[in-house]
């Protein structure tokens, strides 16, 4: 009986902490909208935008690749170039890049083939190679699985006109393209990920980056030692913001919301991605990640329901479960719809309750082992560093070097 009362106590405590987090997320959302209005006012006063270099690694024929690439060629921006990089000359993504770039010949475009990345973190190496050929002072990096609106560059770059700002990053909404499991990941991006970012921005300001978009000044990048500084970190997007903040620059959360295309065809693909993200935050933000175990709601509601029924208090159990479900519905509406405008978060809010329970399982699992999977590579980790990357019969240890192959092609 004592154990059951303890479990009810844990459920009550979890309900309290998740409710406090919901309140903080709401306050963070209010701050986001206030900052967005100020950013829009400042944007309307900008007369001259600096030239920009957009850096985009590509890998294989991803879903909606052509549409995703076209969004970057259709920017309402006066002067910019796009650099693409792949590991192999025969990467099928490069055929799509060439096809799209020919249709937008007015946008300067360069294509690099890097060869096998000699650094444990392949994206960091790819960004480093592209930055060497980038002609402009402002670099905008983005993952290959994002879709952007024509005003993307204007809204992301504008804060960098402030000399004190060294980096800008964005929140994003998930776009499901592959069914139920993919949908869980997508709504997690729109709600859970966004809520965490809003609360961090509210409590301490932005001290990290989000991989789908990072805009950075070359001078700020040079201050932290360039992309090579990130070469053996697992969470290179987090670290670049962390280091630029530590170097004395401001990191800004843009008002722009981008779309992150999610195509995870089955449970295993979804799990590998969720597990990798959880591992990333566990190592890059260990205290915050540990505390995030208290922001889930549904696990505590279910725990309270089971324990209270066992004690003969079904009313209490139903109240705890009801509070948990209501908490997740409100978070889905206030953050998923209210901030990133994800229609799924508004109409299919029940999906986020399932995602919340799954998120707790992933969080707990992140404390097991020291390995993670990304694309066709397996990583062995020690702290926030990669100690070994294995893929397709090859392995790359941290600190080792390789001979990169670079075949830059360009057309104007």
What are the residue ranges of the model-derived segments?
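Cell-envelope/extracellular polymer assembly enzymes that use nucleotide-activated donors
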Residues: 50-53, 81, 239
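Membrane-embedded multi-pass helical conduit in multi-pass membrane proteins
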Residues: 5, 13-31, 292-371
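N-proximal low-complexity "stem/linker" segments adjacent to membrane-targeting elements
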Residues: 1-68
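Acidic donor-binding/catalytic loop of UDP-sugar-dependent glycosyltransferases
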Residues: 92, 142-159
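Acidic donor-binding segment of Leloir-type glycosyltransferases
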Residues: 69-118
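Conserved nucleotide-sugar donor-binding
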Residues: 135-137, 210-224
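Short aromatic/hydrophobic "clamp" motif used to bind/position activated sugar donors
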Residues: 127, 139
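Catalytic donor/gating beta->alpha subdomain of glycosyltransferases that bind UDP-sugars
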Residues: 160-193, 219-222, 227-289, 384-387
């Amino acid at each position: 009986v004592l154990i059951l009362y303890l479990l009810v106590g844990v459920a009550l405590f979890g309900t309290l902490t998740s409710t406090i987090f919901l309140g903080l997320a709401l306050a963070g959302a209010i701050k986001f909208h206030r900052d967005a209005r100020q950013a829009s006012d400042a944007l309307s006063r900008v007369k001259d935008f600096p030239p920009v270099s957009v850096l985009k690694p590509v890998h294989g024929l991803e879903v909606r690749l052509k549409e995703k690439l076209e969004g970057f060629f259709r920017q309402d921006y006066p002067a910019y170039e796009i650099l693409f990089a792949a590991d192999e000359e025969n990467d099928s993504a490069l055929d799509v890049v060439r096809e799209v770039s020919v249709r937008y010949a007015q946008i300067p475009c360069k294509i690099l083939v890097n060869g096998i990345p000699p650094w444990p973190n392949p994206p960091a190496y790819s960004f480093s190679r592209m930055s060497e050929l980038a002609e402009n002072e402002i670099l905008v990096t983005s993952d290959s699985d994002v879709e952007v609106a024509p005003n993307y560059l204007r809204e992301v770059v504008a804060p960098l006109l402030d000399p004190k700002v060294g980096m800008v990053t964005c929140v994003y909404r998930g776009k499901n393209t592959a069914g139920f499991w993919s949908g869980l990941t997508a709504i997690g991006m729109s709600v859970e990920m966004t809520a965490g970012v809003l609360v961090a921005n509210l409590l301490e300001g932005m001290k990290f980056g989000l991989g789908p978009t990072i805009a950075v000044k070359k001078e700020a990048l040079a201050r932290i030692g360039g992309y090579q500084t990130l070469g053996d970190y697992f969470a290179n997007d987090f670290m670049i913001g962390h280091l630029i903040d530590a170097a004395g620059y401001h990191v800004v959360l843009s008002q722009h919301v981008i779309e992150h295309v999610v195509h995870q065809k089955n449970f295993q693909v979804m799990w590998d991605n969720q597990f990798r993200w959880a591992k990333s935050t566990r190592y890059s933000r260990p205290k915050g990640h540990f505390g995030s175990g208290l922001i889930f709601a549904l696990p505590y509601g279910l725990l309270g329901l089971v324990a209270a029924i066992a004690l003969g208090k079904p009313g209490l159990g139903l109240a705890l479960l009801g509070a948990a479900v209501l908490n997740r519905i409100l978070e889905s509406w206030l953050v998923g719809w209210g901030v990133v405008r994800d229609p799924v978060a508004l109409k299919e809010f029940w999906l986020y309750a399932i995602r919340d329970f799954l998120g707790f399982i992933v969080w707990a699992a992140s404390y097991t082992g020291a390995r993670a999977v990304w694309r066709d590579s397996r990583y062995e980790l020690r702290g926030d560093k990669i100690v070994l990357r294995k893929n397709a019969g090859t392995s790359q240890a941290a600190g080792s070097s390789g001979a990169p192959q670079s075949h830059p092609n360009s057309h104007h």
